[in-house]
Amino acid sequence: MSSSIDPADQAAPADFNRLLRANLQRVFNERDPGLRAAAIAELYVADPIMYEPDAVIEGREAISAVAGKLLDQFGADFRFTPEADGIGHHHVGTLRWHAGNPSTPHMVTGTDVAEIVDGRIARLWVLLNPTG
């Protein structure tokens, strides 16, 4: 086992919890397209990629469109809620979450896995838990 440290890992560590919670709150719970776009510009690299179970979404505008469509599809009181603190190391962070409305708060559950580059999300994998 090597004891050498990659110089890229010596930079200040990413705040995985802050970044991944901000993504959930300010992107995937934000109904205002302008505010959502501003959050994406702050939280994501210039050319991010998001991987969903059946789609690959490329670019900030496309990610914003997916978030907006989800919110529109499930109604005004649908929201994503973190289940624990975001954790990570070596440029990869995770955040467990559930989503739903007040009467059915766990309509869907999953985990976001993000590759962090220079303190921003470069790639995001949305892993959904099986239902039933």
Residue ranges: model-predicted function:
Residues 1-132:
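C-terminal and inter-domain tail/linker signature
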